[in-house]
């Protein structure tokens, strides 16, 4: 009898030296971990615990923070600014309302919405973006004038000029003597040098209002309301948006096209009545004033703001309009003079509310949950809006938007996305999608090529918050203990707020990096590997497992094993009392089909390698059935 040759299962030894990251899916391998806290890929291919953080100062009631030449924190109603150059801290009390803020930088100023104020990092001042003046108990005078705000008093009115005029004499030449003050008349001035009459253009209105000149500047766009000019027959369209062309000591000069039967006159409007007087003072009229005169430089209500090409762009979840301020001027949002520096506004046709705004690759981007709107161009005349139906920013996740290495990362209803200028791609396939959905808040930050994402699914509920870290260079996810209800990236540092204090993610990057005050002494960590033993179909068992660990400081490690999905059994522990030491932890597990490994402890460790000794088995590790019935 001849027996067939059968390949013998040999003993083998494998060494795992390249470790992955967090994988919450079914396909979690032995080089990854299915659950864990406070590990990072900073020493890849080894697996190390994160760096200790440093507590900078106690901080409560934080409504937002932003970095621009220093760190600005909005605490309750107060603004606190700490310059990077070590200058004196600036505090502005009762500067804003006690509510969550949307912050954006432009030049040296940090704009704060919805309060519509600006904090100047250069001088520490706070100023309002908008302005409003009301004639409460005051009289306002309206008079036609030239571009420089000058008014004129004619010495005569008629169809023909006087025969012997004096040099500089003013005359009003009319077309209809029954309506001498109508707008189609011509105001002229005589020049003795040339012997000719020259027409004076009165295409502007001088508004004399005490205190108004202090609130507005030249080239501001001001909304004028409540005037009796139309009822007086002086201007048809004075009420509305007007450009301020000149500002004097007590008046403003705005553009207003001549109109009406009583154009050539002065209108003085009081609380409940207005009086019109002709330019030569020969005729007066009384008109009822139903409203109070108001001058306002408007700023739209914006929920999401971003800066792109020296303009602040914004949108609101309550309307389908995208706004851009005047070039370099965040105080003017409705300036339409037909020049390249004009403001800009466009209505979009997509359904749903806006959920976020950001700037990336030179584009101003506006998101809805299922749409991306991209604006490109250099001036209003060539701005172009393109729309893409894709996975956009999830509701309540506007602050998850973060640009890192020329790529925009954000939380969508389907997971974490990356946009590099084309189509968003999902980068969170290894994470549990159900734990990324229906968030109450999401905040993003960046440091050293790592994207930090804080997620809160149920406000105020313990255990429903996570701090996920994505290594964008290696495509690995990790999770850290929650210390980031709010974040602010500086490019070289990441500041985190845990609800009670402000922390620095990397203490070595602080100006006083030598100080150890506030630095975490012990970092708690935990790691659960994927199933070990799924990489081969032969009947072999794990006879020996050796862990190679490095301790960067005094640390403790507890090792536990779970056989075939059973309970955890502690099999080894390690106490490292010296820094910069390497340790080998040999483990001899009992026979099993699959095995999971758990590391738990405090300190700073690095998992360098994992060595597996596999031995041949005689069967029985995995249930075998000789007969199987297949149904198609």
Which residue ranges define each predicted feature?
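N-terminal beta-propeller domains
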Residues: 1-86, 141-149, 297-374, 455-469
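Beta-sheet repeat architectures centered on beta-propellers
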Residues: 2-68, 393-396, 403-407, 414, ...
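Trp- and S/T/G-rich repeat-edge/linker motifs of beta-rich repeat architectures
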Residues: 40-59, 78-98, 120-152, 193-202, ...
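Short loop/turn segments that connect beta-strands within the blades of beta-propeller domains
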Residues: 75-77, 106, 113-115, 183, ...
